[in-house]
From Swiss-Prot:
One of its GO terms (cellular component) is ribonucleoprotein complex. Part of the 50S ribosomal subunit. GO terms for molecular function: rRNA binding; structural constituent of ribosome. This is Large ribosomal subunit protein uL4. The gene is rpl4. Belongs to the universal ribosomal protein uL4 family.
Length: 252
């Protein structure tokens, strides 16, 4: 299957043959497992002090006194039990708990291939919430000159030319302050995902693109299901460079 390659000014440069990975069967079940596996790999096992809440001289006076048989201090305050101040936790976290969801290597590669193929299907991309009206084609491939862009305003001009600015506006307008304790824990804002830019190798365009709302940039060799299907939902609007297409062809 061939698709158009676009210059930075929006004109057509020519055609490029897509790798066979873009014709992979859509498997949302595998994609979900692969993304969850990547997310859980970041979790750190945690536990508590084995004697937390146990370091007390409180004793139970036993039954027959008309009061709960809770261990009490000399002053009569409850201790040791979960419902008492300074008592142990009822069900503390265990370091033995298995947090990482394992996935076979071939399944993980199949999930990535399926997610890449889904990014080229307009119905799936649109169902994910992306604004693709006016986008020339899916998958969207641009000239390798894109990788030499060093300024964010230059990248933004290319996005406007390729009609990707509507999706950037959607992501920017969707930034909201979260409710609850998350605001105090370094994750104050809910930030929608916008365009994913896939480049061939490390280049200046990485720093120039990533400051745009919702935009992520990744090299073709580092691309995984968590990038192209964030939140386990496939169909992310993706911009490929010519070099990235060649690199992807080498991975599959």
């Amino acid at each position: 299957m061939n698709v158009k390659v676009y210059n930075l000014d929006g004109s057509e440069k020519g055609d490029i043959e897509l790798p066979a990975v873009f014709e992979t069967e859509y498997r949302p079940d595998l994609i979900k497992r692969a993304v969850i596996s990547s997310l859980t790999a970041k979790l750190q096992p945690k536990g508590c002090d084995a004697f937390a809440g146990y370091r007390t001289s409180a004793k139970s006076i036993g039954k027959g006194h008309g009061k709960a048989r809770v261990r009490r201090t000399a002053q009569g305050a409850g201790a040791f039990v979960p419902q008492a101040v300074g008592g142990r936790r009822a069900h503390p976290p265990k370091v033995e708990k298995i947090l990482f969801e394992r996935i076979n290597r071939k399944e993980k590669l199949k999930a990535l291939a399926s997610a890449i193929a889904a990014s080229a299907i307009p119905e799936i991309v649109s169902a994910r919430g992306h604004k693709i009206e006016g986008v020339p084609s899916l998958p969207l491939v641009v000239n390798a000159d894109f990788e030499s862009l060093a300024k964010t305003k230059e990248v933004l001009e290319v996005f406007k030319t390729l009609k990707l600015d509507a999706d950037l506006a959607r992501a920017k307008d969707g930034i909201k302050i979260k409710a609850g304790r998350a605001k105090l824990r370094g994750r104050k804002y809910k930030k929608p995902k916008s365009v994913l830019v896939v480049v061939g190798d490390a280049c200046e365009a990485i720093a120039a693109s990533r400051n745009l709302a919702g935009v992520d940039v990744i090299t073709a060799n580092d691309l995984s299901a968590i990038h192209i299907a964030p939140g386990t939902m496939a169909g992310r609007l993706t911009l490929w460079t010519e070099n990235a297409i060649e690199k992807i062809n080498g991975r599959f």
